Amino acid sequence: MKAILIDSSASACSVCVTTDKVVTGHNYVSMDRGHASAIVPMIESTLKGAKTLFEELRFVAVTKGPGSFTGLRVSLAAAKAIALSNNIPLFGVSCFDAIASRVKNNRNLPVTDLLLIVIESKRKELYVECRDKSGTEIIESQALSISDIAGRFESLYQPGESVRIAGDAGGLIVEAIAEIIKPSGPAFTEDFSGVDAFDITTTKEYWALFNSTAKLGYTYQMDLNYLRKPDVSIPKIR
């Protein structure tokens, strides 16, 4: 079973192609803008490198946010075009889930009591979510300022708990979080990488897609998760 995974939710574009759960093609390019012009050539080159044709794909997965308004729509449009033209399912994966799964599956990193994920928004508020070691959300996904993130974290942090900060905006809150956990002794660990399409391969949603051997037709099972209102809206008709 072959699949293509796509992300352009933040300051990068990435594409991953898999065959029977094995990665056969992967491209990742950092970029602050130009996602719309980069994504299709990247998809084509990744498929070519993986020796995979569009008609061989069985499903498409794409990150569904939170992230850049434009970036999320760019990757969704590309993913939807592939799914529709090949009559295959389209699935969405949360950026928080992708990062959390990447961290969890990295055997070089020790397990921590808390995982604080912080994603860049290019605005004053950052996208944040915090999970305990069982994966339960203890700060639900939302957009908060650095001071509000620190306040919420301090209210739930228990002395002695180990912490990992992950996500491309993790570096922005290090100082505030360090002050909270410093009296307790243990240092936090870091994984300040943004989302990569490759991270989708570590999620439980991705692995669940292989449970069915039947060829499925086009389905659209996702909504983009922006976590905040757009900066520009259509004026109301008076």
Which stretches of residues belong to each language-model region?
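Surface "functional belts" at beta-alpha junctions
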Residues: 22, 34, 89-197, 226, ...
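Residues at secondary-structure transition points
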Residues: 30-38, 69, 73, 77, ...
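DPxDG-like acidic metal-binding loop motif
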Residues: 59-95
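Structured loop/turn residues at beta-strand edges in well-structured enzyme cores
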Residues: 52-55, 110, 222
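N-terminal beta-alpha supersecondary unit
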Residues: 1-64
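Glycine-rich phosphate-binding/hydrolytic loop that grips phosphoryl groups
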Residues: 190-228, 232
